[in-house]
Amino acid sequence: MNKLKIVNQEELKDWAEEIFKKNSFNMVDVSSKKETFRRALASGKIYVGKEVFDLIKNKKMPKGDPISLAEVSAVLGVKKTSELIPLCHPLPIDHTATKIVMNEVDRSLEVFCVVSAFAKTGVEMEAIMGVNAALITIYDLSKIVNPNLKIDNVKLLIKEGGKSGLWKNPDGLPKFLENIF
């Protein structure tokens, strides 16, 4: 039978460091940070091919309108981020919006998701998760027509807030987004 051992403060500190910091995953401690306005914009693309593109454009997809459902999925993705990515903090999301742009040239749909919150940590992962949820929903509704779909180029475009301030993707932004933040 193990007996309880009384330890001093120094031994307790060593024990806590051993248990909680070495060889384990830990959520970043944001308890001492102040809440500030945070915003992020992410994007991603799905190439669907001519047949699927035309069906979406003409609102004749067999399982319904992928664009409308993808916009709803993006909201759910944003809200569920901390449940799906283990070390993400649950955040009080103040706003999210999704825009899906159809590109007839390469037969793709590009998803843009913006998220904002007044929080202690950024909303980049929430924006990226919103994009991914929308893209996967489009994939799900389109695969019945053509399973040869390609999700590509999911990335953070802009983040704002916190001590690092404003960051814009060095690869540049689409022209219509250059002055968004």
Language-model features: locations:
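C-terminal binding/interaction regions
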Residues: 2-67, 72-89, 95-181
